[in-house]
Amino acid sequence: MENKSMKTLLKATALAGMMLTASAGAAIDDNTLQVTGTVTPASCLPALSNGGEVNFGNTISEKLTQKDNQLPPKTLTFTITCDHAAKVSLHMVDNNTVGHRLMVIKNAYHNDDDNNEAAYQFGIGKNSKGDAVGAYSVTIAGSPVVNGDATNVIVSAGGVWGYSQTHAFTNGTGVNALLSVAKPDGEIIPMAFKVLEMTLKINAAVASNTDVEMTDAIEFDGSSTIVMTYL
């Protein structure tokens, strides 16, 4: 096999030499082989219902008498549509950290546990004196759906994936917990999909009117970004 390969190489070399000699004496047709194409990664488009806006409506400050006043939970639909099957992770970044006041947010997690962890809360706004008035949390409610089938929410905070008990997003101020989805009967690793649908539950709590001055109207201005990363 080694000799045959060497002979073939020598023949090709000799032929190339003859072609060079011929081109020096007379013009010959130039026959060019072109190989074209493009390698492109899958492209995914995320979309939030209602333009990503969550409106908690009007709350009368005189009614905020508890230490942690719970606002009615809200939901948004989050969909990721890809042109080819892709694996992604999700994390969030709080754009209003100065408006965060550590609260106890009731039944915020997937397992209905309360959220009293700063890393899992986002700033909701400040009063006229610059005091933060509360916080909100963002959790994946239930099981995300791929092709009509339920999936498991998995989490990684250091390169190792495991099942998420809370389904909650961290706020990006510390170690980002990456969330993804996995097949319910397969390995605990991110799965590829073309369309992923999930419901996001947004819970919020506001401080009492004795802990924070509320003589003036307070406009909630919470803002956070969902970051999608291809895996």
List the predicted regions and their residue ranges.
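N-terminal signal peptide c-region/cleavage motif recognized by signal peptidases
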Residues: 19-24
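Sec-dependent signal peptide hydrophobic core
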Residues: 9-17
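Mature extracellular/passenger domains of Gram-negative fimbrial/pilin and adhesin proteins
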Residues: 2-8, 25-231
